[in-house]
Amino acid sequence: MLVLFVATWSDLGLCKKRPKPGGWNTGGSRYPGQGSPGGNRYPPQGGGGWGQPHGGGWGQPHGGGWGQPHGGGWGQGGGTHNQWHKPSKPKTSMKHMAGAAAAGAVVGGLGGYMLGSAMSRPLIHFGNDYEDRYYRENMYRYPNQVYYRPVDQYSNQNNFVHDCVNITIKQHTVTTTTKGENFTETDVKMMERVVEQMCITQYEKESQAYYQRGSSMVLFSSPPVILLISFLIFLIVG
């Protein structure tokens, strides 16, 4: 009995001193981030999760958000200086908007000329049947809009019309020739008559609008009107 007791006691002591076999998260692990001394195929990690070289989230090399290489926002290379900024819209003054709406669209590259609204081509008689028939058959080839400058840049109607006719025929001829169509002397003669009538109509329209704008400015700038407007504002605010 004494011998059996001693043998059993020795076996229990040896069991307590015997090391445990390797397992999950123990020495000899092949997975990263354990810091074990034996058999690790990956370099020791700095406290991050799986695949985190420097303590970031999953797949984050330097501690940024998901898919962020250097800690910036989405698509940002590492700081606010690389952020994409939406370009600000250009400011348009009310004065320019009002002028464009009243006078027509300014044409780029023509030195301040504006393009008038489309008009119906006038019915013109040229004094003989051949030219009258030719005009009726070819009038669609002639301009139905004119180029012009503001009326306040001219001293009289004749100067406005002369400039309007020249620039309109020149632009229409260049544009049409580029498309492969040429004009005869008869075409040029008829275009001059047609465009002249349209330029006169445009001058009358622009002159009327110009004087109406001037009258409105004079009306609202008179002292009685200013006093009345100020009184109404005082009543509304008060």
From Swiss-Prot:
Cu(2+) 4 binds at residues 70-72. The gene is PRNP. Residues 216-238 form a propeptide. Its primary physiological function is unclear. Has cytoprotective activity against internal or environmental stresses. May play a role in neuronal development and synaptic plasticity. May be required for neuronal myelin sheath maintenance. May play a role in iron uptake and iron homeostasis. Soluble oligomers are toxic to cultured neuroblastoma cells and induce apoptosis (in vitro). Association with GPC1 (via its heparan sulfate chains) targets PRNP to lipid rafts. Also provides Cu(2+) or Zn(2+) for the ascorbate-mediated GPC1 deaminase degradation of its heparan sulfate side chains. InterPro entries: Prion, Prion/Doppel_b-ribbon_dom_sf, Prion/Doppel_prot_b-ribbon_dom, Prion_copper_b_octapeptide, Prion_N. Residues 44-76 are annotated as: 4 X 8 AA tandem repeats of P-H-G-G-G-W-G-Q. Residues 18-93 are annotated as: Disordered. Keywords: Amyloid, Cell membrane, Copper, Disulfide bond, Glycoprotein, Golgi apparatus, GPI-anchor, Lipoprotein, Membrane, Metal-binding, Prion, Repeat, Signal, Zinc. One of its GO terms (molecular function) is copper ion binding. Residues 83-93 have a biased composition (Basic residues). Belongs to the prion family. This is Major prion protein. The lineage of its organism: Eukaryota, Metazoa, Chordata, Craniata, Vertebrata. Disulfide bonds join 164-199. Glycans are attached at residues 166, 182. Residues 16-215 are annotated as: Interaction with GRB2, ERI3 and SYN1. Cu(2+) 1 binds at residues 47-48.
